Amino acid sequence: MPNIYLSPSTQEFNPYNGGGNEELYMNLIADAMEPFLRSCGIEFSRNNPQMNAAQSIAASNAGNYDLHLALHSNASPDELSGQLQGPVVYYAPGDTEGQRASVIIANNLSEIYPYSPPARAESTTNIGEVTQTRAPASFIEFAYHDNVLDAAWIRDSIDLIAENVVVSLCDYFGIPFILPSPVRTGKVNSDGAYLNIRTRPSTAAYSKGGIPDGATVTIYGQTGNWYVVEYNNIVGYANADYITII
């Protein structure tokens, strides 16, 4: 299953027009993303507010991630304070996968961002979280927090933004988007055989491991006849015919 490093802003010193700050709202978006990530089977690690950008980069580079995803909001230059608007998603020049992810994210953000200009994807050499990460990287600037309309949009749209970004991640990784549901527990009933945990909801997909008959699993979501499950820290799809909810 896909595995991302989720890096919401730790910049509490960036105030929002109308109250709050960048660290607060970006971490609220990350919090709201977590149930969607789990239901979709996207594994993740996350920074914490005590870390700085260099530490987030180091933590990302210490793992094997399929995407580094940074969550931020923007600020206008002093001479244009409060005047600029719109989402921008950055990637590093030459990072083809980072570019692909950023374009998908920008296109989907344009569907929910209510003002002009629409979201766009741009390359940059000035952001370490795209130029210094081992994994492909996208750095989202959701909107301008010094603009009264943009700041209010972020503040009022936490859940909508979180869902939209995870839809983009599912599109990027080529997996189904699954709305969160209450986490359940199931018991495997496979007549003595091991039940495969697969990377896609298909019997043709690669098996990441097996669940022994009688074992219990955590169920995060469902698409068709497949559950998104976790067993022994392995996350993937398992055939629902062989799992009984308990």
Residue ranges and their predicted role:
Residues 214, 227-231:
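SH3/SH3-like beta-barrel fold
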Residues 178-196, 209-213, 221-223, 244-246:
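SH3-family beta-barrel domains
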Residues 13-24, 75-104:
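A short, glycine/acidic-enriched catalytic loop
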Residues 1-57, 63, 85:
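Active-site histidine-acidic residue metal-binding/catalytic motifs
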Residues 3-8, 43-46, 66-71, 88-91, ...:
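Structural recognition of the beta-strand scaffold that forms the well-ordered cores
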Residues 230-246:
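Boundary regions of SH3-family modules and the immediately adjacent low-complexity/disordered segments
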